[in-house]
Regions:
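C-terminal substrate-recognition "lid" of short-chain dehydrogenase/reductases
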Residues: 18, 101-127, 132
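Active-site helix of classical SDR
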Residues: 12, 48, 56
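Active-site loop-to-helix junction immediately N-terminal to the catalytic Tyr of the SDR YXXXK motif
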Residues: 37-46, 58
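Alpha-helical segment proximal to the catalytic Tyr-Lys
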Residues: 17, 61-65, 118
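Catalytic Tyr-x(3-8)-Lys segment
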Residues: 85-104
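A short helix-coil junction within the Rossmann-fold of NAD(P)-dependent oxidoreductases
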Residues: 14-25, 36
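Residue(s) in the substrate-gating loop at a strand-loop-helix junction
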Residues: 31
Length: 133
């Protein structure tokens, strides 16, 4: 849990001068398991992702005055090589009735790094096809 929780802040602090100069943006990757019980996640993973969501908000407050925005994305079921066995059983419960794609996740990260989201700070965007509505 320590790595997932503290690596992002250590990295951002290490790049603070560069982030300030660029009026940069940090995007942390949490998980839908950080806000709701997930059948495959487990306590350690879920707790670490919830901690990262809280850290994102704190970082947004700390880094915002420096012109650095900090947000997070919380992917749900995304079609990657690390899908848990049994994920197919969850698909009917997702309102869009499909898995997300890595490209869909990447596009949200991209938007969070551009001026399109210049007033978005401290947000956690859930990318889950409506799984938690």
């Amino acid at each position: 849990m320590t790595f997932r929780s503290f690596a992002p802040i250590m990295l951002a602090r290490g790049l603070l001068d560069e982030l300030k100069a660029a009026k940069g943006s940090v995007v942390n990757v949490t998980s839908i398991a950080g806000s709701r019980v997930h059948p495959f996640a487990g306590a350690a993973y879920s707790t670490s992702k919830a901690a990262l969501a809280a850290l994102t908000r704190e970082m947004a407050a700390d880094f915002g005055p420096l012109g650095i925005r900090v947000n997070a994305i919380a992917p749900g079921e995304i079609d990657t090589a690390i899908l848990s066995p049994g994920t197919e059983a969850i698909i009917p419960q997702i309102p869009l009735h499909r898995l997300g794609t890595p490209d869909e996740v990447a596009k949200i990260i991209y938007v969070l790094c551009t001026d399109t989201s210049s007033y978005v700070n401290g947000a956690e965007i859930h990318i889950n096809g409506g799984q938690h509505v």
